Every structure is written in structure tokens, then in C-alpha cells.
Regions:
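Active-site beta-loop-alpha substructure in enzyme catalytic cores
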Residues: 1-63
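C-terminal beta-strand edge segments of enzyme domains
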Residues: 1, 66-127
Length: 127
């Protein structure tokens, strides 16, 4: 986890997004930041999982996905900012674009206090 501008970020890389256990929130971060290289055939999976991680962890999610082509694949982009309710705040579509948005940690804390689902998660240890 890193903190920047008063926001605590959990860092994920590409394929990590597929595994909810890696991003399990215990109230210790405010946003997920995921840099990725998801190919175009899996664009809907990328978009869906980014939203799912935000919803299930009651956090913001920022996903930066590759665009363009290489000999192995075409990359669709679809970078996005998603809020803790799964609503898209900004999206880049298929091109290169700088996305901006405000991660309101006060609104996030109020939502978590009103609906503290993250407290009901089972404790476990990964080995």
C-alpha cells in the first residue's frame, strides 16, 4: 500500500485483478490502482472485474490498461476510474487519455460506516 495526496492505494498488477483475495479490503486502503495489459478479446472481463473489485471492497478503483498493437495481441485500453458503488467516474475508451477524478475519502468513510460489509469478511491466512 502507498499513500498519495491523503488517499491510501493498494497496488495491483494486471492479472492480480482476477483474484479477489489479493485485494481483500479490511478498511486499510481507499483505492485500488491497477496497471494492466489486458488484450482486446478480454475487454469486458477487464471492465467488469475493475468494477467488481471496487464494489466488493467498498473502495475506488483506478485501472490503467494498455492500448495499441504488438505482434501477439491488440489491446483495447478501457482505462477507467470507478467509485465505491461501481459507478464509472471517467473512462478512456479505446485511446490514450489522461483521466482525472476526485476520490472523496470523506464520502467513502461515510458509506463504509453506514454499510460496513467489509467488517463481515472471514479472517484467513494465505500460504
Amino acid at each position: 500500500m502507498v499513500e498519495y495526496g491523503g488517499v491510501r492505494f493498494l497496488l495491483l498488477v494486471c492479472y492480480d485483478l482476477r483474484f479477489p483475495v489479493w485485494s481483500r479490503c479490511r478498511g486499510d486502503y481507499d483505492a485500488i490502482l491497477c496497471c494492466a495489459s489486458w488484450p482486446a478479446p478480454r475487454r469486458e472481463v477487464w471492465r467488469t472485474l475493475l468494477r467488481a473489485r471496487a464494489i466488493e471492497n467498498q473502495c475506488y478503483a483506478a485501472g490503467a490498461n494498455r492500448v495499441g498493437d504488438d505482434p501477439a495481441a491488440r489491446y483495447a485500453g478501457d482505462s477507467a476510474l470507478v467509485d465505491f458503488k461501481g459507478r464509472t467516474m471517467a473512462e478512456a475508451g479505446g485511446g490514450e487519455r489522461i483521466l482525472t477524478g476526485v476520490f472523496d475519502t470523506g464520502a467513502l468513510a461515510a458509506f463504509r460506516e453506514k454499510f460496513p460489509a467489509w467488517r463481515d469478511a472471514d479472517e484467513f491466512v494465505l500460504k
